[in-house]
Amino acid sequence: MESFIASIRLVAATMLICVAGYSAAVWAVGQVLMPGSAQGSLIAAADGKVIGSSQVAQNFTEPRYFWPRPSAVDYNGAGAGGSNKSPTSTDIADRARETVARYGATAENPLPAELAAASGAGLDPHISERGALYQAARVAQARGLPQAGVEALIHEHAFAPGAFLAPDRLVNVLELNLALDRVETAG
């Protein structure tokens, strides 16, 4: 019986250290070293209301906004993941055709592949700078802004995630759309 009680104490101590202690330590390190990321990288509107996260894509469909990559999970953060469909699936091909048609792509003006294909998690908040520039004319026209100004805003918000290791610069779609809203209200 004595060894049984010792075993229970050991299990309790191990759980306390490994579950509660480790979790608390990781949480504390996150709060100190990366408080924004630890809190979900939330983005708030001017009135302080949280409107999204810089780490999760949102579905923008109005022509006045830049559109993110397609999502196999309908931009639902709780169900992140791919569609698990084969690249030869007719569903995938049909969705790609619909997306290409939605953008009005032609043989002379082909759609960047990333804008027709969902990311692995279905929640990628970024598109390439090239993908954003592809949409600039539509967004500028819908907002009544000069295309050069919209393109300048894209370049301003583009960043290289891996410095010299990443071939393409990326743009966060939500942050770019919010910047456009600020430009529109200021102008």
UniProtKB/Swiss-Prot annotation:
Q: How does it assemble?
A: The system is composed of three essential subunits: KdpA, KdpB and KdpC.
Asked whether the UniProt record includes Transmembrane among its keywords, one would answer yes
Name the PANTHER family for this protein.
Answer: POTASSIUM-TRANSPORTING ATPASE C CHAIN, POTASSIUM-TRANSPORTING ATPASE KDPC SUBUNIT
Q: Which residues cross the membrane?
A: 10-30
| Membrane topology, record value | Single-pass membrane protein
Q: What does it do? A: Part of the high-affinity ATP-driven potassium transport (or Kdp) system, which catalyzes the hydrolysis of ATP coupled with the electrogenic transport of potassium into the cytoplasm. This subunit acts as a catalytic chaperone that increases the ATP-binding affinity of the ATP-hydrolyzing subunit KdpB by the formation of a transient KdpB/KdpC/ATP ternary complex.
Protein name per Swiss-Prot or TrEMBL? Potassium-transporting ATPase KdpC subunit
* Xref: InterPro entries: KdpC
A GO CC annotation given for this chain: plasma membrane
What's the main place this protein lives? membrane
Alphabetized UniProt keyword annotations:
ATP-binding, Cell inner membrane, Cell membrane, Ion transport, Membrane, Nucleotide-binding, Potassium, Potassium transport, Transmembrane, Transmembrane helix, Transport
Q: Which family does it belong to?
A: Belongs to the KdpC family.
Looking up Pfam families in the UniProt record yields: KdpC
Taxonomic lineage of this organism? Bacteria, Pseudomonadati, Pseudomonadota, Alphaproteobacteria, Hyphomicrobiales
| GO molecular-function terms, A-Z | ATP binding; P-type potassium transmembrane transporter activity
This chain is encoded by the gene named kdpC
Q: Where in the cell is it found?
A: Cell inner membrane
